[in-house]
C-alpha cells in the first residue's frame, strides 16, 4: 500500500513523449545498434527516409493518466524481485521505492519491461545466488556489472535531441551516456538491485549534462559505475576525477524540502529546479575537496533582496546554465554549500523567464577552495590561438608522443636512422621540425609508438628547410585500418588533407612513409596529428569573444590564412572562440603564460 501511495503521490511530476514521429526517432538507435554504420550515416539515412525529427510534434502525456493495470503489474514485479532475491533483505524500503520500484527511468514512452529483462538476466546470477556474499547487493551488482560491461557499446551523442527511448536500449546498446545509464537502471531494477542515475546538470569542463550510475551495498553506501567506463569496477564516488561543480541523484519522488526552502512559486523557479526529482550528493563525490563557496555582496552587479534565490551557473557554449542555488544574504552575499572546484562559475537570478547575470565569472580552485575572478581590465594583451576546444578531448594528439620519423636506404628499414622523435603532444595543426642529418635517404616514414594505432593525419618531408614544396614519391606503409569503411588507410598520410588520417588496425607496429625513388637529404618535416577538426582551419570565419560586465563582447571576425589566430583582448578576460563556418566543439578559456587554458 505504501509503495502504491509513493508512486501515486509523485505521478504529476512524470510524463511521456508519445506520437508517430517517435517511431522514426527510435529507428536511429536501432540502426546504429547493428554496428554496421557510422552515426552520421545513420542519421542521414533515417532523415532521408522519414524526414527530420521535431520534438515539438510529439504529445506530452502526464503520468496522472497512467494505465492502472500497468502500474499494478509494475508494483507486483518490483515486490516479487525485492522479496525473492537474497540481497533484498539488505535493501531498505526507502531505497526500494526510489531505486527499484519506479516504472520509468525518464520521459520514455511506457511499455512493459520488467518480466522480459528479468527472464533474460536473472539466470546469470543462479551460480552466486546461494553464496553468503549474495546478501550484499554490492557483491551481486559487481557480478552483473561485469556482464553488462562486456557487451558491445555503440556510443554516439549525435541523436541526443529527443527523449529517452525506453527498454529497447537493453537490446540495442546504442546512444549516449544517458542511454547507457538507462540500460543499467532497467537491468538492475528488474533483478531487484537498487540502482540510481547520477547527474551533472552541466559538466564542469563541458557544454552538456552528464549521466552515470550508482549501485549500493548492504549498508546503503553508493558506488559509482558506468558501462562506458574503462573498467566494470564499482568505485567510491570521491574517486571520480572529472570536474563536477554539483552532482545530483535522480529520485522518483519530488524533492519537496528543496522547493519549500526556495520559497518561490513554481513559475518563479528556473525550470531545472521547478519540480526537482533529485537530491544533492555533491559531498560524497567531492570528498575532501568539498567546499562551501561564499561570494560577498561586493562582487554582485547590483544589490539583491534578502532571501532572493541566487543560482550558481556553469558555462555551456556562450550561455550559462544553473546547477545550484542558495538564498541571498545581505550580510554574507551568496553562500553555496557542497561545491567542487576546477570549474568556472557565474552567479545569476531568474527573472522574466531567463537567467540574469549578477557577477563576473570566477574559478573555484579544487584544492584550496579559493576564488579567482575573470575581470576584463583596461590593459590589452595579444593572444595567439591555435584551437577552439580543449585538447584533452582530442585523444589522438597524445598518441603521437614517442612517435618517430625515420630514414633508410633499405625498403624494410632493417637499418635506419632516427630523424626526429616527438616528445610532446602537438598543440597545433601544422607542426614544423628541423632535422639534423647529413645522410641521404630513399625511404622515409613515420613509425607510430606503442598502442597508438599509428594515428597521424599528415606528414611531409623537405629536402631544404627553406622549401615550401615537399618531396614526393610512392606511398608505402602497413595496410589495414580500423573502421567500417576502409577510410583510414596509411595512404591518407600523404593526401594533403589534414582531416583524413591513418588509424592502423593493430595498436602497435603501424607506419606510413614514402619511397622517394632516389636518396634525398631531409632538413625539415611538417606533420599533423589525427584530430577532430578543432584546430584553427584556414579560411573558416572565426569570432573571438571576451566576457565583460555581464555579456560576451566580440573582438572581431577573421578568416585566417594559417593555423593560428592573432587578437588583442583585455588582460585577464574569459574568452570564447566561435567558428561560424562549421563545427560545434567550442569552450570557454583564458590566455595564460602564452597558452590557451580551457575550463
Located regions from the model:
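Hydrophobic/aromatic-rich core segments of domains that either
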Residues: 127-147, 156-167, 173-267
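Short Pro-Gly-centered beta-turn/loop motif in secreted/extracellular proteins
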Residues: 332-353, 438, 568-571
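Short amphipathic beta-strand segments in non-cytosolic proteins
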Residues: 307-327, 406-416, 420-421, 532, ...
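Disordered, acidic Ser/Thr/Pro-rich linker "stalks" and the adjacent N-terminal cap
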Residues: 377-440, 452-524, 528-537, 583-599
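Short acidic/polar inter-strand loop motif in beta-rich domains
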Residues: 350-360, 450-455, 581-587
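Secondary-structure boundary elements
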Residues: 1-172
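Structured interaction patches on ligand/partner-binding surfaces of diverse proteins
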Residues: 351-379, 589-599
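Structural motif
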Residues: 281-282, 292-307, 392-395
